[in-house]
Amino acid sequence: MFTGEESLSIFRSIVASWYESLKDPHNAQTQTLAKLVEAYAKTDYGQRHNAHNICGIEDFRANFPAVGYAELSPYFAEVQKGNYKAFLPEPLVCWVMTRGSTGHAKVLPATKTHLEQIFACGARALINFALKKGDFELLSGKILNLNFPSRVHTLVVDGKEITYGYSSGTYAKLNPMLDKVSLLPRQEEIDALGSGITRKDWERRFELVYQKAVGADVTAAMGVTPVILAFARHIAKKHGKKPKELWKMRALFCTSVRKIQFKYAPVLKRYYGDIPIVEIYSATEGVFAQQIDSLPYVTPNYDAYLFEVETKSGVKMLHELKRGEWGKLIVSTCILPRYKIGDLIEAAGKNYFRVIGRDKPLIRLEHVLYRLFLGWLI
């Protein structure tokens, strides 16, 4: 049980800087920018873009272009050859890949700092929930591992062949915090089933998860929202029981798709019971925001990442957006300067935001129509 003062102190430290950043987002983002450009100045890319002379956000925008994955691919190729300083401020730890849900899978380098931020920010949704609910049994039980495999392809890096896989599985396998908050089954067991992601492959994974978890003290599930739902449907169909009949879960921590609260939550609750659905806005590139309370919005990690938004009236800081204002998100991480993540985001006021979806014509049109007919509700 995580009830000792020492445990509480550790948990509070995980969310403390996040909470503090929400009191003064402008100051938090100023500090984050300073740390980021200091790191970028150590790279060839950063030096080429005058990182050592950046004095503020206007300088940053003037010298660093907003870029997408395609523009950065030549720099990743240099890292692959062994020249990590071409783009990274510190040595490469591993490579990770996206799910490719919107096209070809992207393969990205990961450093120690990047992984540390993924682990720390990724834990905030759980820790914040436990602290605010006073429910530490959530952290004492098992969390269902419904992640993608971490061993999928091979890549030659600096003359050596390495294996890499999907980011969710890789992060789960490397996360030291999971020594205490345990995934069930272990990521190595998931990987042993192979790298496929067909329906049959997922059925084999779901069956492994079910066999390992049945009878165990499972307190939550965490991962890609459609996968969490597909797992529930699988065991209901094959074993005749819903998750709520097998486990007393405290919450579901859901990522990676839009409309989690409005489209998925009602269906998930039919299978898992009337429990909180906690949204996390995460991607291979970072864990950018998470739900802080019962309102159906996410709150940014201003202390770890820099957030800008390209709106119809120009590029603004995310925290500067007025309620109802929206646009294309640009993130800066410890690895990626001014990266066009490809998502649309909308402000709901008071550090609350809603991820609209991918930056695609149909989604933009849908949102324009939504605001036209229901904008008065925002």
Over which residues does each language-model region extend?
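AMP-binding/adenylate-forming catalytic core of the ANL superfamily
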Residues: 40, 321-378
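Short amphipathic alpha-helical segments
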Residues: 28, 32, 114, 369-377
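Short amphipathic beta-strand/extended segments with alternating polar/hydrophobic composition
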Residues: 316-320
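Active-site phosphate/ATP/adenylate-binding loop shared across adenylate-forming ligases
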Residues: 1-28, 34-50, 54-315
